């Protein structure tokens, strides 16, 4: 697979409902960048089995896919620079994110990943303990149905913390800047999710 090989391949194919198979297990620079951007009727995404990913490989892959309700599984545990940047940005029908098991993360890897996913109600556990610059920057920004509180109440019963266990470290103040819309978020701090939200 060559660098940039499928960039913009189905850009604004508004009649595309089911994506083709993408069986590659080793990815390259920007290989799927904006591949399905603004495919407004896409409901069946491809499986994405690769555990060997590359810089910006899924960058904006499903940007503006407003009918997408199910996200593909993302099994990689070691990430690359900007690999998931804006991947589901503007997927307003998406309710649940995929689980994100990566323990080794990279610059900007989850930046803007779910930006503007207005119906998103789930958040993933994020187990990495060494954070990088912009890694979670605006990850859930404008996801208005995700609600966090600093206090445990009847309406906010579920603990949410980054990382779920242990202690995270970062040398960058922007690692989690703007991660959620409704309150400033800090690592190694327990917050509480609204009863309408779930952890995946």
Model regions: which residues?
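Structural signature of tandem-repeat unit edges
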Residues: 1-2, 11-29, 37-55, 65-81, ...
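Register-specific detector for alpha-helical tandem repeat solenoids, activating on a conserved position
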Residues: 7, 33, 59-60, 85, ...
């Amino acid at each position: 697979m060559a660098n940039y090989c499928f960039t913009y391949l189905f850009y604004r194919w508004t009649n595309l409902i089911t994506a083709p198979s993408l069986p590659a297990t080793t990815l390259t620079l920007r290989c799927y960048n904006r591949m399905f951007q603004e495919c407004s009727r896409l409901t069946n995404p491809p499986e994405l089995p690769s555990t060997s990913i590359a810089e910006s490989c899924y960058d904006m892959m499903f940007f503006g896919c407003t009918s997408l309700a199910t996200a593909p599984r993302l099994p990689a545990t070691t990430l690359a620079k900007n690999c998931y940047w804006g991947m589901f940005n503007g997927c307003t029908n998406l309710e649940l994110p995929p689980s994100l098991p990566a323990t080794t993360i990279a610059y900007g890897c989850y930046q803007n990943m779910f930006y503007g996913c207005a119906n998103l109600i789930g958040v993933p556990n994020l187990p990495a303990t060494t954070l990088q610059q912009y890694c979670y920057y605006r990850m859930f920004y404008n996801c208005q149905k995700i609600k966090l509180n600093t206090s445990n109440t009847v309406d906010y019963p579920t603990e949410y913390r980054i990382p779920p266990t242990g202690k995270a470290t970062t040398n960058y103040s922007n690692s989690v800047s703007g991660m959620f819309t409704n309150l400033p978020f800090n690592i190694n701090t327990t917050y509480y999710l609204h009863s309408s939200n779930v952890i995946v």
